[in-house]
């Protein structure tokens, strides 16, 4: 069983207008990193989705490297190609902007979106409802659109309502 806590993990006390989701990275393959997206709620830690990102690299390679461990603000990005495609795909007013991970040193335009393999990431975080291992073959996550639609409504509305959303990346791999 995967232990989602380390002794050194801080327990954050969030204000009523603050929300933090966490990516627990648990497996690094040659081309991808698999994780679990979760959130602490009133009933304990809640599973939200599986995740897939690019692999860890000591030196960043553009669009081929996962972002560093840390906590970052998430805001809505209402411009760019992804925003335009998702506005058409999911429709307005449902789509309010891309979930955009902010102020990552050395990275820009880190989004949370749909996809299945490291070919779809370019450094971004993909979410899905299923996952296969990435040790003996390339990592794959499935039912990505279903997971994205389930998560997006709640997270985007939280931001639209003027609340603070953060995401914490934790390396267990």
Name each model-derived stretch.
Residues 2-165, 170-173:
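Cell wall/extracellular polymer interaction/catalysis modules
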């Amino acid at each position: 069983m995967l232990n989602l806590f380390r002794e050194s993990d801080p327990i954050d006390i969030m204000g009523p207008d603050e929300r933090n989701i966490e990516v627990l990275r648990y497996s690094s393959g040659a081309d991808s990193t698999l994780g679990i997206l979760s959130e602490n709620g009133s009933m304990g830690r809640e599973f939200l989705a599986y995740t897939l990102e690019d692999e860890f690299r000591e030196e960043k390679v553009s669009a081929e490297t996962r972002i560093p461990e840390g906590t970052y603000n998430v805001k809505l990005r209402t411009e760019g190609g992804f925003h335009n495609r998702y506005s058409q795909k999911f429709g307005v007013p449902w789509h309010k902007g891309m979930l955009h991970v902010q102020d990552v040193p050395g990275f820009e335009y880190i989004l949370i979106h749909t996809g299945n393999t490291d070919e779809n990431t370019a450094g971004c975080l993909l979410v899905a409802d299923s996952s296969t291992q990435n040790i003996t073959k390339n990592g794959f996550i499935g039912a990505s659109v279903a997971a994205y639609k389930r998560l997006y409504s709640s997270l985007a509305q939280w931001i639209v309502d003027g609340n603070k959303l953060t995401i914490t990346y934790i390396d267990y791999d």
